[in-house]
From Swiss-Prot:
The gene is rglC. It comes from Emericella nidulans (strain FGSC A4 / ATCC 38163 / CBS 112.46 / NRRL 194 / M139) (Aspergillus nidulans). Transmembrane segments: none annotated. It catalyses: Endotype eliminative cleavage of L-alpha-rhamnopyranosyl-(1->4)-alpha-D-galactopyranosyluronic acid bonds of rhamnogalacturonan I domains in ramified hairy regions of pectin leaving L-rhamnopyranose at the reducing end and 4-deoxy-4,5-unsaturated D-galactopyranosyluronic acid at the non-reducing end. Residues 707-720 have a biased composition (Basic residues). It is an enzyme of class 4 (lyase). Keywords: Carbohydrate metabolism, Cell wall biogenesis/degradation, Glycoprotein, Lyase, Polysaccharide degradation, Secreted, Signal. This is Probable rhamnogalacturonate lyase C.
Length: 1041
């Protein structure tokens, strides 16, 4: 149990008043002062914060007032209560590095006692340098509360309280004068103000009428330095000054080169971690220990005529990971987790690029993970470099290890992805990237450059102000969509201009919330975009398949910036629909974890994602063709701050292609980031992800819904699987983006007898007996949690039917065991699933690894074994568990579908049966269950009272089987046997069930598919399923979900 107050701790590593070469350290009762001949800082003994910084006699911070007038200092959004600014008495260290240069370090570590998490800040002054080298460390060790929360924000701030600083500089082309503190401000949305009434403010006259810190956001790819500039008009000596944050390393940031974040306003930021623009955050779980940095706060000065550009260039010379490498090696002993040069190497090589590739870049990042989401491993690192004209690249000082390589370039669709690339020595690597293509390109809109900046109000300069900032940087409400597109978007390929005729945001409606220029929302001609194009007969000749590919630069779903906690909102996953010539329609549900505030926060490059719409080329025609791209009408989100409530997407680019014979017609699209929604209900997918259903027809009154062609669903699944392999997605990604279950009408068009049989049989398959209160035993059933931890209701017996993990690692398994062990249920039964490769002896023998035993704590782990559960009063239940499923892919615990011996070990007196997979045709979407298992149950003399399984996520639910003629007929139909005759039998039995309770004599078995994290078109959130058993009679009673 931790105390309820903050504990201030420090390690005194060496404190003295000394002078080594040009460095001097002094102290008094309240401060330590560290200085060289030009630069000095004062550090408060009470909290370790820098409260004074002086360069050449000029005060850079001003007086201390709260959190102003100090820095760099550290804070975070990381505690259960929210933000925390740590502070503790610091320790000083000193020494001489390998070059003979002296240094002094200030180390502050503070512990948040109620959670036992720590923040540490390390600041070093070296020799005659006029700046501070900064590292930050976060730890969380707390076995009693394994998961604390996400690390929402972590940042260091240089926060002056002085009028010295006259200008901001975000990047080389984005700078301007600071707004005056006296300027009248009108709040127009969260963190955004209108200053235009004060026309003599230099910011207003030169840069913009609106101010928000998001205007000064920069993308990490080319970013080197940002900060404050003083033009000399406010300095004591008339000289110019600069305060800069230098990105000399970027390996410990997240999100790769596509990440963008705040850099400067009245504060010089170092945003180490944030959720801005949909960026993911790492989770603080027991054992989290990560050091970020180094970065370098540099302070410089020049004569009265020195320009901002000159001081900026002086700081930018340090933006190299090779700068000061010897120094960082020397102080590594003071910096936990920092890897010195002995553990680093140079990653170099050559890329054979597709023709036409511009601005190619190579990225090293967390293995087997999209670099935009590289927060899952606490030691995740990232590096990137531009690829030159010859295809060569060099990345110095890479920590040795195994990485994912990602390559992308302007003008080229898709990505090159290769996992398990070992960076150990300095050997050259060679990669060959072939552009994705499905045939001959018909048309292209936009440039695939990972941003929506080329469209209206994107990168084009705002010529109304002398400094001409890019339009997207300015408050979005300035650009009135109804005025720009009074008739909506109607874009004709070959005639329209992308810079004028497509907006940088595709709204579901144009909002008035957060828009001080409009009192009412505008709905007309907003959510549907129309793209028209002409085709000739020769372009269509001998074509079979068309593919329309869309790449998004960002999307705003109802989930907002939340990544791992799906919101139960209607448009959590955002549907984007393409209608082709009014005769074909397909919907892409944009997953919630790609959502973020992008366009409304002055962004054109956020979470990139893409999708291919594949359809029959026969839907295209000679002459005029029309695509309608639709967001649901009036799709909204709930906003707790003053922000627009309209959902949107922003498109990167689009392309259309056709091919002959058996090859496909490819239509690829890259457009501005836009989002759309539709009538949706929630359902839980892998890792607790909430998804949505297909849109209801009434949401799109002008779009018809044709009966799909036979085989269309299989074809789309195949294409999406193929796409996932090309892009190096994880199994999780593929599952999350797989096709939805079709509607009853769609299934009826494809297989009328089977669909009718499913409907009729389903009407009577969930009836349960009325509940009594005598000797009740509650069984709580879950399965396929895949690292998630759903809320579990109270009960007597907890059953987990496998797939506890996603990747099958020991670390993942231990976390799930820890979670299940903490549950209060008397008995906790667990089996493995096909994801638990760590537990499968055969899997390890085939892959050259050795299986290690697990500590199951209070859990009863069954692997083709039984256990007796003593319920008291002479009542017992026998439970048998098996992890095995029919062969499918390369998972664990699999057997050939032709094997008839697997289920012979089930004891005849089994009361509770737990298998990972279902018997075929029962709670078995896609008919992937086991026919042999089903037959084994038929042959048992005394069938189980309860059978719990998972594996088939879309089959979630419960069913009562009575082992009767009705069930025989239904199963025969599902197996394709005498379908018409068995359908008649099924109707006959269904009529009888209207009048008789077929479960009254206890012959029935309750089947439960408890897959909590998914389901193809099952539209309810996955909770545990409960079944009550009357212990004395061993009869099931009504249950709960």
């Amino acid at each position: 149990m931790f105390a309820s107050t903050l504990r201030k701790t420090f390690v005194f590593l060496g404190l003295a008043t000394y002078s080594a070469a040009a460095l001097t350290t002094t102290s008094n009762s309240t401060h330590y002062t560290i200085s060289n001949s030009r630069f000095s800082v004062a550090v408060a003994k009470s909290n370790g914060h820098v409260v004074d910084a002086n360069l050449d006699g000029q005060d850079l911070l001003g007086p201390l007032s709260g959190n102003s007038g100090k820095g760099p200092y550290l804070d975070c959004s990381c505690t259960p209560e929210g933000f925390w600014t740590p502070g503790a008495e610091p320790a000083l260290v000193n020494g001489t590095d390998s070059t003979g240069t002296p240094y002094v370090g200030v180390i502050m570590t503070d512990t948040y006692e109620t959670t036992n998490q720590t923040l540490s800040q390390y600041l070093f002054l070296r020799g005659e340098e006029t700046g501070l080298h900064a590292f930050s460390r976060v730890t969380y060790y707390n076995e009693s509360d394994y998961f604390l929360r996400g690390l929402g924000e972590l940042r260091t701030l240089f926060r002056p309280n002085t009028n010295l600083w006259t200008h901001f500089s975000g990047s080389e082309g984005n700078y301007g004068p600071m707004p005056l503190s006296s300027t009248e401000k009108i709040t127009v949305q969260d963190a955004t103000t209108y200053l235009g009434d004060t026309t003599d403010d230099p910011y207003v006259s030169q840069y913009s009428d609106y101010f928000t810190k998001y205007t000064l956001t920069e993308s990490w790819r080319d970013h080197d330095v940002h900060g404050h500039f003083s033009n000399g008009s406010t300095s004591g000596d008339g000289n110019t000054y600069g305060a800069w944050l230098v990105h000399n390393t970027r390996e410990t940031y997240y999100g790769g080169p596509l990440h963008a974040d705040l850099v400067v306003d009245g504060i010089v930021y170092n945003y180490i971690v944030s959720g801005h623009y949909g960026a993911p955050n790492p989770n603080l779980t027991h054992g989290f220990d990560r050091t970020f940095g180094p970065q370098y706060y540099h302070f410089n000065s020049g004569g009265p005529g020195t320009t901002l550009e000159e001081l900026r260039a002086d700081a930018a010379q340090y933006a190299s990971p090779e700068w000061n490498a010897e120094f960082y090696d020397s102080i590594a002993k003071h910096i936990p987790n920092y890897v010195p040069s002995t553990g680093r190497t140079t990653f170099r090589g050559k890329v054979n690029l597709p023709k036409g590739a511009k601005k190619p870049i190579i990225v090293l990042s967390e293995n087997e993970q999209d670099f935009q989401l590289n927060v899952f491993k606490k030691d995740s690192l990232q590096y990137w470099a531009e690829i030159d004209g010859s295809g060569a690249f060099t990345i110095p000082r890479v920590v040795k290890g195994t990485y994912r390589v990602t390559i992308y370039a302007d003008e080229i669709f898709g990505w090159f992805i290769k996992d398990n690339v070992k960076v150990i020595g300095s050997n050259a690597h060679t990669f060959t990237w072939k552009e994705e293509t499905a045939g001959k390109e018909i048309w292209r809109i936009g440039v695939p450059d990972k941003s929506s900046g080329e469209f209206l109000h994107g990168y084009a300069p705002d010529t109304s102000k002398p400094l001409q900032p890019e339009q997207y940087r300015i408050y979005w409400g300035k650009y009135d969509y109804p005025s720009d597109f009074p008739e909506g978007v109607n874009y004709h390929v070959g005639k329209s201009d992308p810079a004028k005729d497509l907006n940088y945001i595709h709204w579901s409606f144009f909002p008035s919330q957060g828009n001080h220029l409009r009192n009412e929302p505008y709905y007309q001609n907003v959510n549907n975009w129309t793209i028209t194009f002409d085709l000739t007969a020769s372009q269509l000749r001998n074509t079979k398949t068309a593919t329309f590919t869309v790449q998004l630069a960002g999307t705003r779903n109802a989930n907002g910036n939340s990544k791992w906690n799906p919101d139960p909102a209607k448009y959590n996953n955002l549907p984007w629909t393409v209608n082709v010539n009014g005769i074909y329609e397909d919907t892409w549900e944009i997953p919630y974890w790609r959502s973020g505030s992008c366009g409304v926060r002055s962004g054109v490059q956020c979470q990139n994602t893409e999708h291919k719409f594949v359809f029959d080329a026969g839907k295209l025609r000679k002459g005029r063709n029309e695509f309608v791209l639709s967001l649901p009408f009036n799709a909204t989100s709930v906003e707790t701050a003053l922000l627009p409530n309209s959902l949107y997407v922003q498109v990167v680019s689009m392309e259309a292609v056709s091919v002959s014979n058996d090859m496909r017609v490819l239509v690829q699209a890259f457009m501005p980031l836009v989002t759309w929604g539709t009538a949706v209900e929630k359902r839980v997918l892998l890792t607790g992800i909430v998804s949505v259903s297909a849109m209801a027809k009434e949401d799109y009154p002008m779009i018809s819904r044709p009966c799909p062609r036979k085989g269309g669903t299989r074809r789309r699944k195949k294409e999406r699987k193929k796409e996932g392999k090309k892009q190096g997605r994880t199994v999780l990604d593929a599952l999350l983006q797989r096709s939805e279950q079709d509607s009853f009408w769609s299934r009826f068009c494809r297989s009328p007898i089977e669909s009718v049989a499913q409907y009729v049989y389903g009407q009577g398959s969930t009836a349960l007996r009325k509940k009594t209160t005598d000797n009740l035993v509650r069984v709580v059933c879950v399965s396929d949690t895949h690292n998630t931890k759903p809320n579990l209701p109270d009960g007597d017996i907890l059953i987990h039917a496998g797939d506890l993990t996603e990747s099958g690692t020991k670390e993942e398994l231990e976390k799930q065991i820890y979670w299940l062990d903490s549950q209060p249920h008397r008995y906790k039964i667990v089996i493995a699933g096909n994801h638990e490769t760590f537990l499968d002896r055969n899997y390890h023998s085939h892959h050259g690894n050795e299986r290690v035993t697990m500590d199951w704590k209070s859990l009863i782990y069954l692997e083709n074994t039984s256990a007796i559960l003593d319920l008291g009063a002479g009542h017992q239940l026998k439970v048998f568990g098996s992890p095995y499923t029919p062969k499918h892919g390369n998972g664990a615990f699999q057997y050939p579908r032709t094997d008839t011996t697997t289920w012979e070990e089930i004891p005849k007196d089994t009361d509770l049966l737990v298998t990972h997979g279902p018997p075929k045709a029962h709670l078995d979407l896609g008919h992937l269950g086991c026919r042999v298992l089903r037959q084994a149950l038929w042959e048992m003399e005394s069938r189980p009272l309860l059978h719990v399984f998972g594996h088939i996520h879309g089959g979630y639910g419960k069913e009562v089987v009575c082992w009767d003629l009705c069930q025989r007929a239904y199963e025969a139909i599902m197996d394709g046997e005498s379908r018409w005759w068995n359908l008649c039998v099924l109707f006959y039995c269904w009529i009888l069930r209207l009048f008789f309770d077929w479960t009254a004599d206890g012959r029935a078995t309750v089947l439960v598919n408890a897959a909590t994290v998914g389901g193809v078109r099952d539209l309810k959130r996955r909770e545990a399923i409960c079944v009550d058993i009357q212990a004395g009679s061993k009869r099931f009673l009504s249950g709960c979900t």
